[in-house]
Amino acid sequence: MKLPIFIADAFTVTAFHGNPAAVCLLESILQEDAHQQIAREMNLSETAFIRKLQPTDSFSQSSCFGLRWFTPVSEVPLCGHATMASAAVLFHKIKNVNSTLTFVTLSGELKARRAEDGIVLDFPLYPTFPQDFHEVKDLIKAAIGDTTVQDIQYSPDTRKLLVRLSDSYDRSFLESLKVNTEPLPGIEKTGKVKGLILTVKGESGGQTTPYDFYSRYFAPWVGVPEDPVTGSAHTVLSSYWSQQLGKKEMRAFQCSCRGGELDISLRPDGRVDMKGGAAVVLEGMLTA
């Protein structure tokens, strides 16, 4: 087995920032268990597999492909940064001639289009609903201790729990917050929660780039203690903060140690555009 493989850093224009994802190009159907074996070998938060939908398709000429994502332990239904990485590989390395690519995925058809200063992902927008604190208090206590919480929301479509911290906290507090993810899968094992979003309101003005909101994302349930920059979490965050701020256009920053930023635009059709950069940092051949 020989497969072209790449690593691209998504939601950044600078190598070694953003969120790295491995991208495999599949000329033909891959044995099912090989997807997970390769993802485990790559040991990144996600490995993406792009496959041709028809034998006559071409990675440089076709505009529609199949796409799957795997963490080191399981397949996931949606991954933003690995979709961004996949589009970057096709656009920048394979020199795909199309301006827009369509990916057929477990979350339906997702589109990625070229932009002058990056790549725009067309993703679903998922609503949130108020979550009873007492149902998740043990989970939150284990994760962030006595940190003051302002709001708790739940996204049933993505099984993500959104925890908004007090507006008295700023970006530096969120960045330095020690989050204990190890016990979380043992505390919440009903399957209701598969990801924890922590978020704070942004600041305007000042000497630094203004962001509308900041976040961090944790998914120990699928083998990812903390994800550097998470497109799928922003399908939830965009819905929540748009309602809170009364805005359709927002800029977001994910406060992991690598960091990454997204330009967000809520669309009239109920979906969300997320724009970011990507840097391909490795290309080679997987042999097994």
Swiss-Prot record:
Matching InterPro entries: Phenazine_PhzF-like
Q: Which cysteines are joined by disulfide bonds?
A: none
- Kindly indicate whether the keyword Lyase belongs to this entry: no
Regions that span the bilayer = none
Q: Give the positions the UniProt entry annotates as the active site.
A: E46
Assembly, per entry: Interacts with UNRIP/MAWD.
Family per similarity comment: Belongs to the PhzF family.
Q: What is this protein called?
A: Phenazine biosynthesis-like domain-containing protein
Q: Which organism is it from?
A: Rattus norvegicus (Rat)
Question: Upper taxonomic classification of the species?
Answer: Eukaryota, Metazoa, Chordata, Craniata, Vertebrata
Gene name per UniProt: Pbld
